[in-house]
Each structure stands twice: as C-alpha cells, then as structure tokens.
Regions:
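Flexible coil/turn residues that form the inter-helical turn or adjacent wing/linker of helix-turn-helix
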Residues: 161, 208-210
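Alpha-helical DNA-contacting segments of helix-turn-helix folds
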Residues: 143-148, 155-156, 182-207, 230-247
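Membrane-associated alpha-helical segments
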Residues: 212-213, 228
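Conserved active-site tyrosine of GNAT-family acetyltransferases
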Residues: 227, 231, 253
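Aromatic-anchored, glycine/proline-accented short structural segments
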Residues: 168-176, 180-181, 194-198
Length: 253
C-alpha cells in the first residue's frame, strides 16, 4: 500500500521512489522554502536525514495520530525513508512505541551517521538514494520479522482497516488484552487506532485513483456523514475538497 503522509504546497519540491519491498515503503526528498508542511497519520516509522547547521542529521520519527504540523516544516532539505506500516527496524524496537507524534535524534548510531556524512546539500535525489540503498543493509536492521506484530498488521491491512479486535484475536489465537498491549508497546498506538489510520489511507488511495463509488460503504462506515467527519479529522479536508485539490495538483502527498 502506497501510504500518503504530507500535505505540501506546490511551492515545495517533493520527489519519491516507491519501493514497497516488505521493509521500506518509499524513499523521498523534500526541498522546502520555509513553507508549512502538514502530516497525515500513516501508521509508519520514518528515518529522516535533516539538513541543519551545514550537515545532515539522522532522526527517527513515529506516526501522527491526527493531521498536524510536521516537524520538518522548518527544515530546508530532508532525505527520508518510510518503513512499511507495522515494520519496526531492530534498532528502534526498544523505543518505537515512544515515537508517536515525536522524533528522536539518532546521531549516536555510527552506521546512520556514516550514511549522513556522505550526503551533500546540493546532491541529487538519485545520488542520495544510491548512497542510502548501498549502505543500509537489510540483514543488519531486520533480523526478526516473523512476530505477532507483523501478523496483526497484515490482518488489518488485508481488511483495509475494517476489522474488530475480537476478530484479530480469533485469527491469531491470542487474548484480546494481550494483543492490544504488545501492539501498543511496539508501535505506540492501539490496534483500533492503527486500523483507523489504515482505513483513512485506503480512502485516500481510492480518492486519488478516482475509485469514489460508495467509499464509505466499502470501508465500513455507518454512513457518508461518518466517513466525511473521520476523513476531515485525519486530513483537514473533506473527501470532496481533497479530490478537487488533488486533481488540480495543488498538493503533493
């Protein structure tokens, strides 16, 4: 699933490379002339190399839980790596649950700092992407993938967010309270919140691909009013407004 994270003015330069390889969803770069950038909940963890004080500094950040100003709004240039929803690199597992709506400087990680020092302010996106993919070795960061968190996330994705906690418990064979506890400890949000984010992301996909016929029914909303309210809470726009703005290419997401 191609997740959408940012509401960005057309004055901001944004480019992305979609990977969707089971670990990394996409790589992206933002050149920002001091414009505000809003973040949409996406259920993902990001690794961002932010240009500040003449050098690139590595940060990790978690998902937002509602539409809000992104931390990168005041940064001139950002090279970002968005992991797949529900995927937690090994080095983040001890604190990933604390990253919701915040970010952490990880300059103390030698491997990431070694990548950062190879980036130049005027370097092209393609060159930066080549450097990152050459030095970020999956075997070093994803040694343990088969776990209950990945299983839960997979169920939620397959159901487009339209699944109850009790259904997940039945499919996994675990107690509901146990599942919700370990899921929140790992990702920082409850299974219910995570499912809600995935549902909105699916709605965005439908809107961007003109698959608008009875979206609210396909995504399990009570009625259209319920869908509109939830969509606006998560994106700041009504579905109709979002569709118009997107069709006019006034925003990059």
């Amino acid at each position: 699933m191609q997740v959408k994270t940012y509401l960005i003015s057309k004055a901001v330069s944004y480019h992305e490379l979609i990977l969707e390889d089971g670990y990394i969803n996409k790589i992206y770069i933002i050149d920002n002339p001091d414009r505000e950038i809003y973040a949409i909940p996406d259920a993902c963890l990001d690794l961002q190399f932010v240009y500040e004080k003449g050098r690139f500094v590595p940060y990790v950040c978690g998902t937002h839980t509602e539409v809000s100003l992104a931390f990168i709004g005041g940064s001139k240039k950002i090279f970002g790596v968005k992991f797949e929803p529900g995927v937690v690199p090994d080095f983040m597992k001890s604190y990933a649950g604390e990253l919701v709506c915040t970010r952490r400087n990880v300059s103390d990680m030698e491997a990431l700092s070694n990548i950062a020092v190879q980036f130049g302010k005027d370097m092209s996106f393609e060159d930066m992407a080549d450097i990152f993919t050459s030095h970020f070795i999956y075997a070093d960061y994803f040694k343990e993938r088969k776990n209950i968190i990945v299983q839960i996330a997979g169920i939620i994705h397959n159901k487009k967010g339209c699944v109850t906690i009790s259904d997940i418990a039945v499919q996994t064979g675990y107690n509901q309270r146990y599942l919700d506890r370990v899921f929140k400890e790992s990702l920082g949000v409850s299974m219910k919140k995570y499912a809600g984010i995935i549902r909105i992301q699916k709605a965005i996909y439908y809107l961007q691909n003109n698959l608008t016929y009875e979206i609210y029914e396909r995504l399990g909303y009570y009625d259209q009013a319920h869908f509109i309210k939830d969509f606006k809470k998560n994106t700041s726009l009504t579905p109709n407004k979002f569709g118009k703005v997107n069709s006019l290419s006034l925003i990059h997401i």
